[in-house]
């Protein structure tokens, strides 16, 4: 590449400035003479630090070029392997594709949870910055911030209509928000430590919460009263999730177990113990996936003629396990993540499992063949949460890198 006379002169002056400002006096004198430079104060100011600036911007551009090349290679690979352009897929087989549709910034601390609204085209994110943010996932627009908690917001949950949002926090409270007026309508106190998980029960009448105080509590939406406490875990309860009809709740804990409770009696129906580290996350299988799970695992159909219920768990032991709750059996273990598994759920088509982890990836698993079929390098830091839209082709992820990303499925 040939430089013009002006470019050559600028480069020489920048080199001369670098040599002089870094104390290479002898080299500076020789170079100045050889390059026939006439240095003066006005010009000196213009070229001060220019060489370093050019150098760092070249490195930045190189990094950007490498990122774009890798995205291009992923797109080529997808095209040749019969991806979205190569063939028409059944929507039940749509999976998230790189690159992300939107990377949304606004939180000032790690994102702890992301969820889709059940009705409108919005999603909600919670963060360690003590706020909850609302975004439009179709346009990528930021809508509003909900403030009220005084410490990290750990989990959020909508009721089935999307009119109510529950949140819980390290400030030891649970808050209920009117999602139409965006106001906090109730604050519930009762846990003695960080409240790490919250879920509105399917009937919409009760909220269930889990805490570092080792308990699970059930609250009445109408009054905010605590009506039940489930005890049994020996350490911090990380997550709690009700099944589809609200008769059972599942919980997971630092005590390395997953427990399933009968809501009506508070009885622990099953204690699932095969993980070798803290269990971070759980997710119930939708009934639409029961037949394909039974087929894939050869699990017995009970006397009632109905398989299931089935449950997924993700752990710091880097594995994902699938359980048959009725027998307490571990049906399979999926191995592939290189760090703590932080989020796991079933694809709405019922054939796949999606997971995210501290290895910065979002993964899609074909559980019938027990293999990871797609790995997306989703974030710059740990991926803390994911959600899959029930009807629209979108996945959302949140990360310690403070961003929320929207992924299109096709």
From Swiss-Prot:
- Keyword Protein biosynthesis tagged: no
Q: Quote the InterPro entries the UniProt record gives.
A: Dynein_regulator_LIS1, G-protein_beta_WD-40_rep, LIS1_N, LisH, PAC1-like_LisH-like_dom, WD40/YVTN_repeat-like_dom_sf, WD40_repeat_CS, WD40_repeat_dom_sf
Extract the ranges annotated as region (Interaction with NDEL1).
1-102, 388-410
Listed under GO biological process in this entry are: cell differentiation; cell division; establishment of mitotic spindle orientation; lipid catabolic process; microtubule sliding; nervous system development; platelet activating factor metabolic process; reelin-mediated signaling pathway
Q: Name one GO cellular component term.
A: 1-alkyl-2-acetylglycerophosphocholine esterase complex
Q: Name one Pfam family in it.
A: WD40
Q: Where is this region: Interaction with DCX?
A: 367-409
State the disulfide connectivity: none
Subcellular location per UniProt equals: Cytoplasm, Cytoskeleton; Cytoplasm, Cytoskeleton, Microtubule organizing center, Centrosome; Cytoplasm, Cytoskeleton, Spindle; Nucleus membrane
Q: Which UniProt keywords apply?
A: Acetylation, Cell cycle, Cell division, Coiled coil, Cytoplasm, Cytoskeleton, Developmental protein, Differentiation, Lipid degradation, Lipid metabolism, Membrane, Microtubule, Mitosis, Neurogenesis, Nucleus, Phosphoprotein, Repeat, Transport, WD repeat
Stretches the record annotates as Interaction with NDE1: 1-66
Q: Segment Required for self-association and interaction with PAFAH1B2 and PAFAH1B3: which positions?
A: 1-38
Q: Where are the WD repeats?
A: 106-147, 148-187, 190-229, 232-271, 274-333, 336-377, 378-410
Superkingdom: Eukaryota
List of residues that carry N6-acetyllysine: 53
Q: Tell me what the record says results from residue 149 to R.
A: Loss of binding to the catalytic dimers. Loss of the ability to regulate PAF-AH (I) activity
- Region annotation Interaction with dynein and dynactin: residue ranges? 83-410
Q: Name one GO molecular function term.
A: dynein complex binding
Family membership, please give it: Belongs to the WD repeat LIS1/nudF family.
Q: What is known of its domains?
A: Dimerization mediated by the LisH domain may be required to activate dynein.
Query: What additional remark is attached to this entry?
Result: Originally the subunits of the type I platelet-activating factor (PAF) acetylhydrolase was named alpha (PAFAH1B1), beta (PAFAH1B2) and gamma (PAFAH1B3). Now these subunits have been renamed beta (PAFAH1B1), alpha2 (PAFAH1B2) and alpha1 (PAFAH1B3) respectively.
Assembly and interaction partners: Can self-associate. Component of the cytosolic PAF-AH (I) heterotetrameric enzyme, which is composed of PAFAH1B1 (beta), PAFAH1B2 (alpha2) and PAFAH1B3 (alpha1) subunits. The catalytic activity of the enzyme resides in the alpha1 (PAFAH1B3) and alpha2 (PAFAH1B2) subunits, whereas the beta subunit (PAFAH1B1) has regulatory activity. Trimer formation is not essential for the catalytic activity.
Q: What does this protein do?
A: Regulatory subunit (beta subunit) of the cytosolic type I platelet-activating factor (PAF) acetylhydrolase (PAF-AH (I)), an enzyme that catalyzes the hydrolyze of the acetyl group at the sn-2 position of PAF and its analogs and participates in the PAF inactivation. Regulates the PAF-AH (I) activity in a catalytic dimer composition-dependent manner. Positively regulates the activity of the minus-end directed microtubule motor protein dynein. May enhance dynein-mediated microtubule sliding by targeting dynein to the microtubule plus end.
Q: Which HAMAP family match?
A: lis1
Stated name of the protein: Platelet-activating factor acetylhydrolase IB subunit beta
List the taxonomic lineage. Answer: Eukaryota, Metazoa, Chordata, Craniata, Vertebrata
């Amino acid at each position: 590449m040939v430089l013009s006379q002006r470019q050559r002169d600028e480069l020489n002056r920048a080199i001369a400035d670098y040599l002089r400002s870094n104390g290479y006096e002898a080299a500076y004198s020789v170079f100045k003479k050889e390059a026939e430079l006439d240095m003066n104060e006005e010009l000196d100011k213009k070229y001060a630090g220019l060489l370093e600036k050019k150098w760092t911007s070249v490195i930045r551009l190189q990094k950007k070029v490498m990122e774009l090349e890798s995205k291009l290679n992923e797109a080529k690979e997808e095209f040749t392997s019969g991806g979205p352009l190569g063939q028409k897929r059944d929507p039940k087989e749509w999976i998230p594709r790189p690159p992300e549709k939107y990377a949304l910034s606004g939180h000032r601390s790690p994102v702890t949870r992301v969820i889709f609204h059940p009705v409108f085209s919005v999603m909600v994110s919670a963060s360690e910055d003590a706020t909850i943010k609302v975004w439009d996932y179709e346009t990528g627009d930021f809508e509003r911030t909900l403030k009220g908690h005084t410490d990290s917001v750990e989990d959020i949950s909508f009721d089935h209509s999307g009119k109510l949002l529950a949140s819980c926090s390290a400030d030891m409270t649970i808050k209920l928000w009117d999602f139409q007026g965006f106001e906090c309508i109730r604050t519930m106190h009762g846990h003695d430590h960080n409240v790490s998980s919250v879920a509105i029960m399917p009937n919409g009448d009760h909220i269930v919460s889990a805490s570092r105080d080792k308990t699970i509590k059930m609250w009445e939406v109408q009054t905010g009263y605590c009506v039940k406490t489930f005890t049994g875990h020996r350490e911090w309860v990380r997550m709690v999730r009700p099944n589809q009809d609200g008769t059972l709740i599942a919980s997971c804990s630092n005590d390395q177990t997953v427990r399933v409770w009968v809501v009506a009696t508070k009885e622990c129906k099953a204690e699932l113990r095969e993980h070798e580290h803290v269990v971070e996350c759980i997710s119930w299988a939708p009934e639409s996936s029961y037949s394909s799970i039974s087929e894939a695992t050869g699990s017995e159909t009970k006397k009632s003629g109905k398989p299931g219920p089935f449950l997924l768990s993700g752990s710091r032991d880097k594995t994902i396990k699938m359980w048959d709750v009725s027998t307490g059996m571990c049906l399979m273990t999926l191995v592939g993540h290189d760090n703590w598994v932080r989020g796991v759920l079933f694809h709405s088509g019922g054939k796949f499992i999606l997971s995210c982890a501290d290895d910065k990836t979002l993964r899609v698993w074909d559980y019938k063949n027990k293999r990871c079929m797609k790995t997306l390098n989703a974030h710059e830091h740990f991926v803390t949460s994911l959600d899959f839209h029930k009807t629209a082709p979108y996945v959302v992820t949140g990360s310690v890198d403070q961003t929320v990303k929207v992924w299109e499925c096709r």
